[in-house]
């Protein structure tokens, strides 16, 4: 649909460096400064809950008590009531300046529309779901949404048994960035199946493998 075409820009500059939470904080603060007059809704998502907590406290320290920005934390520990007390004002535009730090809980079933996103990379499926939380209503005032991807918690070590964490199938691979931009997920799933087939090939004889796929 033309309304949603190019509504979100994916930025990979933070993947070019070994990111630290202090470096990430500086980057977020710079974006906040650029949006000081107009305001912005910023979503920052981590894989690990502890990292989300750590970054929340770093941002709280940086903002101080007098900041006009609302700083909120959302994890799986929150009750439905606590979660809604954060999400409702965001949905209803009560807060013009808000930073929401979260775990991947925001990827599924959370109805919010943010302007700027930061995400620790994991599976490509997760990246696509995250993009769905940014600029959902399309380009605002001529400004598209933007998502900065970074690599902090090394998702391949967390999801060790998930073949989708093979580097060639993540945003560590330039081709997957194109897949994400152009929404060519058929290419992604074909490569996932190819990789799975290779893995099966190591575990079974060639005849057994061909039988496995011919029967599936």
Where are these regions (language model features)?
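C-terminal helicase lobe and adjacent C-terminal extensions/tails of nucleic-acid helicase motors
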Residues: 25-45, 50, 54-65, 69-70, ...
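A short helix-to-beta-strand connector/capping loop
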Residues: 6-10, 66-69, 96
């Amino acid at each position: 649909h033309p309304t949603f075409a190019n509504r979100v820009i994916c930025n990979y500059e933070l993947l070019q460096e070994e990111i630290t939470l202090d470096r990430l904080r500086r980057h977020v603060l710079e974006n906040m400064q650029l949006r000081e007059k107009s305001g912005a809704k910023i979503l920052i998502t981590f894989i690990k809950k502890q990292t989300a907590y750590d970054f929340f406290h770093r941002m709280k320290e940086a903002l101080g008590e007098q900041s006009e920005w609302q700083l909120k934390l959302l994890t799986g520990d929150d009750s439905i009531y606590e979660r809604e007390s954060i999400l409702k004002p965001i949905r209803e535009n009560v807060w013009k300046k808000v930073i929401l730090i979260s775990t991947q809980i925001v990827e599924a079933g959370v109805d919010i529309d943010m302007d700027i996103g930061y995400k620790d990379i994991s599976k490509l499926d997760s990246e696509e779901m995250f993009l769905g939380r940014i600029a959902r209503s399309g380009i605002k005032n001529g400004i598209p949404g933007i998502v900065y991807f970074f690599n902090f918690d090394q998702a391949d070590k967390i999801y060790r048994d998930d073949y989708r964490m093979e580097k060639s199938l993540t945003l560590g691979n330039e081709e997957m960035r194109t897949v994400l931009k152009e929404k060519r997920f058929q290419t992604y799933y074909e490569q996932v199946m190819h990789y799975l087939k290779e893995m099966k090939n190591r575990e079974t004889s060639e005849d057994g493998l061909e039988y496995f796929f011919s029967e599936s």
